[in-house]
Structure formats: structure tokens, C-alpha cells
Amino acid sequence: MHFVEAKGLLTGSGGQYGMNIYRGCTHGCVYCDSRSACYQFTHAFEDVEVKQNAPELLEATLRKKRKRCMIGTGSMGDPYLPAEKDLCLMRRCLEIIDRHSFGVSPLTKSDLILRDLDLLSRINSKAKAVVQMTLTTCDEALSRIVEPHVETTVERARALRIFRDEGIPTVVWLTPILPFLNDTEENVRGLMALCVEAGVKGVIHFGMGMTLRESDREYYFAALDRHFPGLK
């Protein structure tokens, strides 16, 4: 992990913006598209870049904006990485989003997001908060292989139910579907059953498969060779 003083935080325009407080990830997911060379990481993917001045940048930007909109986060790094537990940069950004009455939609695989349930509830009451979470497999043993450092599917499903009970809408990313690993009808039906039970408002499949772009492809194939010899 390394810290930087970023020059900017928000990207996008119009009705929706994005931000990445963390760039890179320590979840270790073998299928992660964010490893792709097209994103031009100048550091090792696991050496997470932390924008330590993110709250200050967000405050300065939102203070100038007259039109309220949604702010998404989590495309280039989970906003609730283990480091967030101590750094609290995401929480500080949520406080700013709440203060300026903007909406927010974080994408995560971590139930650490429950720490910020109070802020997300407040934002949802004034603007809109939509929690997005990725689910890939009902097989916890497989999950430990393909996404080794994230919460279990059971723990993530529990978090979704808690948000449901708090009236905060949720969306599930049912992706990726990995050939010969989690592509069974039993698995897809099991994940959909968890979504129904949690009352999610939408399911995103994003084509279901992987992009297999440069760097992402090599990392995934190496993982297949280690854990599932001959499958590649």
C-alpha cells in the first residue's frame, strides 16, 4: 500500500460521477478485470494506491456543484478494503456526500460496509443510496479459491438482508460466470434464490463472462494452472 496526494477524485459528468479512493485491490480475485493493462496501472495491483486527500478533494468539488447527482465508487478498487477499517476514508467521503445531499452507490464484496449503515440510511432518506454487491458462487470452498480474501457468500447475503430491512435498495452483480467452475444451473439458481430472499432490486450480469484482456487473462490462466490443472 502506498499513499498519494491526488489531483482529482471525481470522474464523469451529468447525472452520475465516479470516484476511486483506492486504486488496486487485495481481495485476490483471480478473475478481476481491473488488472487489465488497459487501465494503465503504474504499480503492482496489490500495492494499493490510497488517495489520502480524497475527502478534501470531494468536499471542494461538491461545494461547487449546483446539480445533485449519484456518485458511484468501487470500479478500480473496493471502497471497503481491509485498510478502510482503520483509514476511514470512505466513511469521511460518505459524511461529505451526506452533508451536500448527493446520492451514492458503492460496489463492494465486503460486509465492512455495514459499519456505515447509519450514513447510508441518512443519505437514502435525503437523496438515494444504492448498495451494490458481487456474488459469484454458493460453493464456499470454490469462493476461497477464486476470491480468497473476501467475505463468504453467506456473509455478503446477510449484509444484503440487513440493507433490505433498513429500506436501502440493493443490486447484485452476478458476475463473472466462469466456465466449468461456477456455471452450473444449481449455482445460478442458488445465487438467484439468495437475491430473492434479500429482496434485491436488480441483478447485473454484465455478459456474465470475463473480458480476458491483457494482464487479466494471464493472471486468470495462471490461477487455473495452479488450482485446476488442465482446465485452461
Q: What kind of region is each of these model predictions?
A:
Residues 1-132, 140-144, 153, 157:
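Conserved Radical SAM active-site core
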Residues 77, 110-112, 135-139, 176-178, ...:
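Active-site-proximal loop/turn and secondary-structure-junction residues that shape catalytic pockets
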Residues 87-88, 121-133, 182-200, 225-229:
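Short, electropositive alpha-helical surface patch
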Residues 117, 144, 183, 215-217:
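Short, well-ordered secondary-structure micro-motifs
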Residues 136-140, 149, 166:
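Histidine/lysine/aspartate-rich catalytic loop segments that bind and position anionic ligands
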Residues 155-215:
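Conserved C-terminal portion of the radical SAM core fold
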Residues 217-232:
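Acidic, Ser/Thr-rich peripheral helices and adjacent loops at domain boundaries
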